[in-house]
Regions:
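Acidic/His-rich segments in extracytoplasmic proteins that coordinate ligands and/or metal ions
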Residues: 1-35, 107-148
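Basic- and aromatic-lined ligand-binding clefts that recognize polyanionic substrates
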Residues: 40-92, 165, 197-201
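Structural recognition of the beta-strand scaffold that forms the well-ordered cores
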Residues: 14-16, 68-71, 96-99, 121-124, ...
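Structured C-terminal subdomain patch of bacterial secreted/periplasmic proteins
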Residues: 24-34, 43, 128-201
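His/Asp/Glu-enriched short active-site or ligand-binding loop at hydrolase and phosphoryl-transfer sites
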Residues: 82-105, 125
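Extracytoplasmic/secreted envelope proteins and their assembly/folding machinery
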Residues: 1-5, 26-29, 33, 43-46, ...
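Second-shell loop/turn segments in exported
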Residues: 12-19, 30-39, 74-76, 163-170
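Sec-exported extracytoplasmic/periplasmic mature domains
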Residues: 6-9, 34-38, 54, 58-61, ...
Length: 201
């Protein structure tokens, strides 16, 4: 970085982006827009994303039902997503059975998962696309008691393209929120799941 900065006509401005929540992503979009002289474009993008977030929240609130959701970020060891992933589940109208918005990933014990009786399971291995994520499915389905879980019995266990929609804190995270909303509340949402983004387990 030092060598590169010496070759530039002006001293570069270094912007550190370390978002933790969805609101941080919107703030960072505006910060980058301001720093690059593209404030109007950045504000328009952030505003449009915020509109989509609010739409999901408002529609999800129409249902008194809050399904218990297990969001898995890894299978060996078993990890549940934290921070923005828990926030996404809650905005989409679910209750995260494990995970905490104030913490990062949480290591889980399989017996704890069985005891939690999740009604929706979202397998979204961090950084994996859908094809790679599917390779982790047998690790889950071979575990004792898998077939007894409510989510499995009701056909509500899914694998997601985490690389595109849940792992990276950028604009596509909002599409990830919309995907979760339809998976958690299919009676309220439709047309939210892009082709090739989700598979059944």
């Amino acid at each position: 970085m030092a060598e590169l900065s010496e070759k530039l006509p002006n001293e570069p401005q270094v912007i550190s982006l370390d978002p933790t929540y969805i609101g941080d992503v919107l703030d960072d979009i505006r910060r980058v827009g301001l720093a690059t002289g593209k404030s109007d474009e950045a504000d328009n993008l952030a505003d449009s994303l915020e509109t989509r977030i609010n739409a999901v929240r408002e529609i999800a609130l129409k249902s008194p039902d809050r399904p218990r959701v297990l969001q898995l970020e890894w299978t060996e060891p078993l990890l549940s997503g934290g921070h923005w992933v828990v926030e996404m589940v809650e905005l989409a109208g679910g209750i995260s059975v494990f995970g905490d918005k104030t913490q990062s990933s949480m290591r889980l014990d399989w017996d704890e998962i069985v005891a939690s009786q999740p009604e929706v399971i979202l397998l979204m291995p961090c950084g994996f696309d859908l094809d790679r994520a599917r390779e982790d499915i047998p690790t889950l389905t071979s575990l004792r008691g898998w077939e007894s879980l409510p989510a499995v019995q009701e056909g509500r266990a899914y694998v997601l393209d985490a690389s595109e929609y849940t792992s990276r804190l950028g604009p596509r995270l909002i599409t990830g929120l919309e995907i979760m909303a339809e998976l958690i509340h299919p009676e309220l949402f439709s047309g939210m799941v892009p082709e090739g983004s989700v598979g059944a387990i």
